[in-house]
UniProtKB/Swiss-Prot annotation:
Induction: By abscisic acid (ABA), cold, drought and salt stresses. GO terms for biological process: hyperosmotic salinity response; response to abscisic acid; response to cold; response to water deprivation. Keywords: Membrane, Stress response, Transmembrane, Transmembrane helix. Belongs to the DP1 family. Predominantly expressed in stem. It comes from Arabidopsis thaliana (Mouse-ear cress). The keyword Membrane applies. Its main location: membrane. This is HVA22-like protein e. It is a multi-pass membrane protein.
Length: 116
């Protein structure tokens, strides 16, 4: 049983960097090289949210140490953000981040240029 727990622990520790960094880095490079703008939006949104999550963790570190499932919850949330089936990063960006930036005047509305 100890070996099983050790193996699961090691897998859990390895899953974080793979899900949070390696796959998004690879997918971001592929997105930049593709002609589509849709995947660019997904990965820019992901890096914005991941940066915010990391900054929040730094600020709340002493509190998060008391939450035993924090790392697992973060791993599941980030997996939802990055998996192409869900496109969670683009969803959160469009529904939360963009709206808050507009609300506080940080993001100006797009102005359509008319042909002369």
């Amino acid at each position: 049983m100890t070996k099983l727990w050790t193996s699961l622990s090691a897998l859990h520790s390895l899953a974080g960097p793979v899900v949070m960094l390696l796959y998004p880095l690879y997918a971001s490079v592929i997105a930049i090289e593709s002609p589509s703008k849709v995947d660019d939006e997904q990965w820019l949104a992901y890096w914005i949210l991941y940066s915010f999550l990391t900054l929040s963790e730094l600020i709340l570190q002493s509190l998060l140490e008391w939450i035993p499932i924090w790392y697992t919850a973060k791993l599941v949330f980030v997996a939802w953000l990055v998996l192409p089936q869900f496109r969670g990063a683009a969803f959160i960006y469009n529904k939360v981040v963009r709206e808050q930036f507009k609300k506080y005047g940080i993001l100006k509305p797009k102005v359509e240029h008319q042909a002369e």
